[in-house]
Each structure stands twice: as structure tokens, then as C-alpha cells.
């Protein structure tokens, strides 16, 4: 049985001799041939060579031509920022910069890099006749967001008719791209629409379903297979996705595989995923990759399932980790060996973040896969960038790309489970949802207010007036009361001590009175029992 036949049977929901395996090699294939991402994604020759090397190393049943959700956007006038280890990121939105929808035309093969992708598809089809060739296209909602920007979320409420018109145009672009990839020899059209994770089922059915139903119907009429790719916290949309007419749903690690299995089987469609991209494939060891692959196989079963990464493979993914997955797929004995391995992988070291967020400034942490490679991550980072100037000098923000181990440790230490996520002073606030500007500002301001209140509470103090009653003591008390009135403070407790033994406790002798001693209180712990070692550090400051 060829890989192509295996994929076709899996799409039909039938049992195969083994589960088919499709590594989503995009710019990672560039690394395999020594090319950076920009050079790779601009060259049909390099794409052809990179895919050939990936096929040789990873022994797949199917392979994507390319994995770049900016191809259509670039052809339609979006400005791109290129990187050496990631696909490009959209940096400007034509419909937000004076261009109208009437000005746009469905791009042809001569537009942007579309011709490069199609030429690569034709060569890959010819070079690998036994494999299922995937042609990824940008989904209409993600393309619409590239063209308009995050303003689309407000327009869905304020001007739904405009959004429908924009999505209809993006549908036509997707139909054109799908047809061109099919004519170039692709067996599977993968409609990749990660930004749908930002909307709920009702909005999905209102805006996305009508468009993608037409796309999947057209793909089916041309004799090709279709897959709906989604990433992020999109579990709520799986049931409506399954009713769009797609032949397969492919997910990442944010969605439980068992949930997708049940939903897809209800609708008699196949499903794929969801090897962990960063913690396992990028940062783990071959044994970690094999354990993860085996766990996916055990959950998914043997019918209608395609083993794949959760999304486009990171550029620097160690080839040995993907080769280890291929061993699990191809060798039943290897699967048995991995099952028998008793040693557990060591837990990731965790940071002690109990005191995190106690500094004067508010810290906004954005946990991402990589804002240069992941569209939802990019738009979440952009949302924070846009509001940060409102809090200059008060708020600091930083992105934590979990493709780096230290960021992964930080993520697990904060108990973050999904990306992208915004945390404010260590508290998870926005999970896989790009907050509107006003909502984000309100969340940051709320934390600023909380810190201000805590600072006031922690700065309470007592003034001890030492000495017998006298004219000077009366004058001293009057001066203190006037100072408090002028400052508008009432948080200072005033206590008068006139006994010699009480005065002596402060190191003051009778001849030095009247004297004033100020004792300031600092809150050191709330809602927890601090450890002895922590208390010792406090005592050292006394």
C-alpha cells in the first residue's frame, strides 16, 4: 500500500495497515538543505530539494508543498517582515491603509510567490508519485484579518455586511488557490484558518461556515480531498467545523485528541494531529517524541486518523526527533519497546514565582509559540504593543516564545496551558483570545489600581511620642497633627509613651525627650505560610 492510498483510506474512515504519518515540513525543510526561511520560501528549487530531503529522512505518507499563510496576503498587498527561521509575518493591512475592497483582485499565478508554490507542487508531484501531496491555502477568516487587521472583530458586530463582503472575496481567493493546487497535482487541499480560534461557534457559523462550505464543495467536485487545519484554543468550534463538509480536521495540542476523535466520528470524517510542537518535537529528545507519538496512536485508534504535528514544524526541529516518530509509525516492535520503557522523563524544572508581580511596575507577559511564525500569537503581541504607550513608565511587557526552553519553563511555572496567553503580574488573564483594546486597557488598569491599594496598605506606620507631658510635647503633637492634615493622611497611628521603661525600649534616655520614633510596617506575606528560609531573609533586613 502506498502512502497516498493509505491517506485516501484514512480520509474515508477505513482501517489501514498502519496509521499514516504526515510531517508538516514548511521552513523546517529549508534547514534540512542549509537554507534560511526567506531564501527557502522564495525558491521552487529549494522547496523541491527540502521536501525531497524530508521524504528521505522521515518516510512520510504525505507531505505539504509549503506552509506559509502569507502567500495570498502578500499577493494582495500586505507588507511582510521576513525572518531567517520563520515564515514571514504580516506587518501592514491594505484595507486599513486606504485600499478598498473594490480595489482588490483575486491574484493569479503571476502574483507574488504564488507561481513559486505552484511550480514546487508540480515538481513534488512528479518526484513523489506514491505520496499524498498537500496544498495548504489560507483560510478566508485568517486572510480577511491579514487584509483588514484586528478591526474585523469590531466590524463583526458593527458592520456585519462589510465583513460578509470581505469574507466572500477571501473565499474566492481560496477557491482560486485550491483549484490551482489541484491542477498542479495536489491530492489534499489543507485550508489553514488559525484565526478562527478567536471567535465562538455562533460567529463561526454566521461568518465562516458559508464560505468554507463552498470551498470544500468545490474541492470535492474536483476529485481532491480536503482538510480543515486549526490551532489554538478552538475546541468550542470543532462541532461546527465538522459540519462544513471538510474531509478531515487537523488540530494542535491545545485541543484534546479524544474530543476531536469523537466529534469527527459522529460526522464520519477523519481527523489528524496532534504531536506537541515545542515541548516534545523541538525541545525534547527522540524518546520523548516516540512516547508522544505512541500516546496519540493509542488515543486515536487505527481508523480515520492521520498522525501529524500540531502545526508547521519549527525551523530548528531536530531531525532525529522526527525520525524517531517515523520509527514508531513503521515498526510495531519499536512501539512495544517504547511501551515497556519504565523510566519517566524528568519533570521540567520550575521557577518559584510566588513573589512574581510584586515589583512596582506591572508586568505583562505574552506566552506565544512565536509571534513571527504564528498568526494568533502575532496579533496578540500586537494588541499589547498598541496599548503599552498608554502606560509608559508604569507597565513593562515581554514575549516568551516557548520554542526556547527557558520560555517553556516560564510557561509551566505560571501554569499556562494554552498559547497564546496574556498574563498580568503572573495571573492568567486572556487565554487564546485577542482582547479588544478597551478590555486590555481595563485589565491592566485594574492591576495598577490593585497595586496602588496594596502600596497604601503596606505603608501604614506608627509614631511614638516619648516623654512626659509638657509644653514641648503639646507643640510636637500639634505639629504632627497639622502635617497629617496637610498631607491628607490618616493611616499613621500616634502613641504617647511617658514611662521610663517604655522609653528605654527605643534606646532613648530621659534627658533626650521629647523624642519621636517612627515604625513603618511592610506587608511581607498574604494568604500563605512563608517558608523558614524566606522569613530568615526578612529578619536579616532588620
Language-model features, listed with the residues they occupy:
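Non-catalytic, surface beta->alpha helical segment in thiol-disulfide oxidoreductase systems
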Residues: 424-453, 519-542
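Structural micro-motif
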Residues: 412-424, 507-519
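Active-site-flanking structural segment that lines cofactor/substrate pockets
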Residues: 28-59, 398
Amino acid at each position: 500500500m502506498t502512502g497516498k492510498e493509505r491517506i485516501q483510506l484514512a480520509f474515508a474512515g477505513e482501517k489501514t495497515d498502519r496509521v499514516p504519518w504526515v510531517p508538516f515540513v514548511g521552513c523546517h525543510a529549508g534547514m534540512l538543505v542549509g537554507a534560511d526561511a526567506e531564501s527557502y520560501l522564495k525558491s521552487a528549487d529549494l522547496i523541491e530539494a527540502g521536501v525531497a530531503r524530508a521524504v528521505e529522512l522521515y518516510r512520510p505518507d504525505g507531505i505539504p508543498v509549503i506552509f506559509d499563510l502569507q502567500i495570498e496576503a502578500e499577493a494582495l498587498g500586505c507588507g511582510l517582515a521576513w525572518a531567517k527561521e520563520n515564515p514571514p509575518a504580516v506587518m501592514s493591512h491594505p484595507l486599513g491603509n486606504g485600499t478598498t475592497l473594490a480595489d482588490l483582485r483575486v491574484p493569479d499565478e503571476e502574483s507574488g510567490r504564488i507561481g513559486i508554490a505552484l511550480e514546487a507542487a508540480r515538481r513534488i508531484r512528479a518526484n513523489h508519485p506514491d505520496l499524498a501531496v498537500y496544498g495548504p491555502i489560507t483560510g478566508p477568516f485568517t486572510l480577511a484579518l491579514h487584509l483588514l487587521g484586528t478591526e474585523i472583530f469590531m466590524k463583526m458586530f458593527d458592520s456585519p455586511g462589510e465583513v460578509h463582503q470581505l469574507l466572500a472575496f477571501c473565499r474566492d481567493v481560496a477557491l482560486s488557490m485550491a483549484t490551482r493546487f489541484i491542477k498542479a497535482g495536489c491530492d489534499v487541499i489543507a485550508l489553514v484558518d488559525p484565526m478562527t480560534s478567536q471567535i465562538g461557534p455562533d460567529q463561526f457559523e454566521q461568518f465562516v461556515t458559508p464560505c468554507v462550505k463552498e470551498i470544500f464543495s468545490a474541492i470535492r467536485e474536483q476529485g481532491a480531498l480536503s482538510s480543515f487545519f486549526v490551532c489554538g484554543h478552538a475546541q468550542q468550534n470543532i462541532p461546527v467545523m465538522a459540519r462544513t463538509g471538510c474531509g478531515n480536521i487537523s488540530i494542535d495540542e491545545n485541543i484534546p485528541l479524544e474530543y476531536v476523535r469523537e466529534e469527527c466520528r459522529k460526522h464520519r470524517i477523519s481527523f489528524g494531529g496532534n504531536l506537541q510542537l515545542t515541548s516534545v518535537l523541538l525541545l525534547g529528545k527522540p524518546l520523548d517524541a516516540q512516547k508522544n507519538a505512541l500516546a496519540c496512536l493509542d488515543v486515536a485508534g487505527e481508523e480515520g486518523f492521520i498522525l501529524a504535528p500540531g502545526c508547521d514544524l519549527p525551523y530548528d526541529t531536530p531531525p532525529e526527533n522526527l525520525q524517531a516518530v517515523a520509527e514508531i509509525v513503521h515498526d510495531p516492535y519499536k512501539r512495544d519497546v517504547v511501551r515497556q520503557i519504565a523510566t519517566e522523563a524528568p519533570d521540567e524544572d520550575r521557577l518559584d514565582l510566588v513573589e512574581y508581580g510584586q515589583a512596582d511596575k506591572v508586568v505583562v507577559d505574552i506566552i506565544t509559540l512565536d509571534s513571527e511564525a504564528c498568526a494568533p500569537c502575532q496579533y496578540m503581541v500586537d494588541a499589547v504593543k498598541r496599548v503599552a504607550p498608554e502606560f509608559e513608565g508604569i507597565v513593562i511587557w515581554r514575549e516568551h516564545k516557548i520554542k526556547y526552553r527557558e520560555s517553556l519553563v516560564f510557561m509551566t511555572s505560571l501554569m499556562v496551558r494554552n498559547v497564546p496567553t496574556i498574563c498580568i503580574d503572573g495571573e492568567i488573564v486572556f487565554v487564546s483570545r485577542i482582547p479588544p483594546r478597551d478590555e486590555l486597557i481595563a485589565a491592566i488598569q485594574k492591576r495598577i489600581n490593585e497595586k496602588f491599594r496594596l502600596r497604601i496598605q503596606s505603608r501604614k506606620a506608627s509614631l511614638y511620642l516619648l516623654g512626659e507631658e509638657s509644653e514641648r510635647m503639646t507643640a510636637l503633637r500639634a505639629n504632627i497633627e497639622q502635617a497629617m492634615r496637610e498631607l491628607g493622611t490618616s493611616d499613621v497611628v500616634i502613641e504617647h509613651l511617658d514611662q521610663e521603661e517604655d522609653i528605654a525600649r527605643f534606646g532613648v534616655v530621659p534627658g533626650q525627650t521629647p523624642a519621636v520614633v517612627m515604625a513603618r510596617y511592610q506587608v511581607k506575606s498574604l494568604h500563605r505560610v512563608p517558608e523558614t528560609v524566606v522569613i530568615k531573609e526578612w529578619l536579616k533586613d532588620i
